[in-house]
């Protein structure tokens, strides 16, 4: 008997490799941080400013295990790229992520648009 699971997948992640390698992040680490950034900035979120997706849900986006997500979260936290609320375990990216990754991407886009 086949069980029909409702899968949650993200379409794509544009990886900025220069800052990724500068911070020693794997592609998985980058994808996890990028998902946290976008989920915590969703204006329709019931908890604006925080990503409240479970580790399992984050894993389902990329076909990664819960353990892999936890390892990525630990890596990102150690590099001060995300923070974890100790009480709720919600996640959000830090100003450092924004400065080093989001602004980098915006700078590149502007450079090649005009």
Segments from the language model and where they lie:
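Short recognition helix of helix-turn-helix/winged-helix DNA-binding domains
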Residues: 1-64
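Winged-helix/helix-turn-helix nucleic-acid-interaction surface
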Residues: 66-114
């Amino acid at each position: 008997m086949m069980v029909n699971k409702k899968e949650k997948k993200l379409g794509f992640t544009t990886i900025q490799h220069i800052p990724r390698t500068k911070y020693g992040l794997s592609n998985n680490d980058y994808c996890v941080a990028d998902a946290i950034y976008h989920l915590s900035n969703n204006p329709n979120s019931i908890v604006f400013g925080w990503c409240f997706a479970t580790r399992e849900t984050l894993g389902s986006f990329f076909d990664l295990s819960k353990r892999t997500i936890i390892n990525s979260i630990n890596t990102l936290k150690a590099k001060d790229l995300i923070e974890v609320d100790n009480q709720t375990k919600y996640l959000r990216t830090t100003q450092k992520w924004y400065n080093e990754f989001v602004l980098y991407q915006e700078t590149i886009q502007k450079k090649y648009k005009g």
